[in-house]
C-alpha cells in the first residue's frame, strides 16, 4: 500500500508526461502546443515554416546587432533575430510532421506530387524549350529592314493615371474598416471585379496593338485601385507606392486573370481551351490570331516558337491547380500579394525590400488570424503550403517564358521600345 501511494523517484520521472509551456518560448504570448520541437504559438510556428521551409531565406538584422526582442505584445520587427531565436530554442525543419494532414492520404496525392515535380523541370535545351526542332532561318526574318524598333509606346499617360489613383483613398464602409488589412484587400478584389461579365462573354479573336494598349491601361487602373485597399500600403510615401506599383502591376493582372479563368471554368462558364483575357473578353487558344505587324517582322510560326504554346503562356497548370484548391478571396489576395511583394522586393532590394517584407509580415499574421477565426483547431498548413507552391510554380513558369523572350530579343525578333521598360519587370 505504501509502495503504491509513494512511488519511487525513478519510476515517477519516467512516467510523468512532459508539460507544455503556457507561454510561447519565441514571443512569450500564450502557447498553442509543441511545434517543430519547441513550445510555441501558431504564429511563430507559421513564421518558421514560411521562412525556413518554404522560402529558405536569410535576412539582415534591422538594428545590426542581432539583439532584437519582441515588443510587449509579442510582435517581432526583425526577421533575423526572430529566426535566430527559433533555431536557438531547437526548432528544426526536420521536425515537421508531414503526415498529420488528412489530405496527404488522398489516393491521387503522390501521383499529383510527381506530376508537379516533373512539370517544374527547366528545359535543358532550346529544342526542348520550344517543344520542336528549331528552324534555322532567323538570320533573314521578315523584310530584313535594319531598324531598331517598329513600335514605340509612351507609357507616361498610364503612369499619370496610376499617380492619381495612388492619391485617392477608397471609400470603405464601417463594417469593412474594422476588418484586417488582408480582408480589406479581399474586399478590394471584389470591387475591381464588379465589371466582370460572367455569362456570354464576347470572344476576342485577334490581339493587336490597340488591344494590348487597352489591356495595359485597364490593368494598371485595376491594380492600383486594388492595392490601395491595403491600409499599410496607403501609409507609404507617394514615391514608394509608385515604385512598387510600377513593378508589380503587370504581374497582378496576369495572376488575377488566371484566377478568374479558374473560377469561371469551375462554374462551367467557359471552356477548357478558353482564357478570360479581360473583364469583357475571352480568348480561345485554337482560334486566337496574333497581329504581329506592330512588334515583329517574323512569321507566325517563328513567333510562336519563342513564346511557346498558348496554354503554357497562360499558365494552364496553375489554372488547373486553382480549380482544385478553390481559394477564398482572402486566400487569393494573400497569394497575389505574396508573389508580387516577394518578386518586387527581390528585384529592387534595399529600402523597397524592407517595405515589402514588412507588408508581407502584416498579411501573414492576418492570414493566421483568418484561419483561426474559421476554426481555431484547424491545421491550415496544407492550404498555405498549396498557395505558396502555386507561387513557386508561377516563378518557375515565368523563368521558362523569359528564356524564350531573351532568346527572341537576342535574335532581334521582337522590336518594341518602351518609354518606361521597368514597368515590365515580370511581364512574361
Curated annotation (Swiss-Prot):
Coiled coil location: none
All copies of domain NR LBD, residue ranges: 181-427
Pfam families (alphabetical): Hormone_recep (PF00104), zf-C4 (PF00105)
SMART domains: HOLI, ZnF_C4
Subcellular location: Nucleus
DNA-binding region range list: 21-98
Zinc finger (NR C4-type): 24-44, 61-86
UniProtKB keywords: DNA-binding, Metal-binding, Nucleus, Receptor, Transcription, Transcription regulation, Zinc, Zinc-finger
GO molecular function per UniProt: DNA-binding transcription factor activity; RNA polymerase II cis-regulatory region sequence-specific DNA binding; zinc ion binding
Main location: nucleus
Protein name: Nuclear hormone receptor family member nhr-44
Protein species of origin: Caenorhabditis elegans
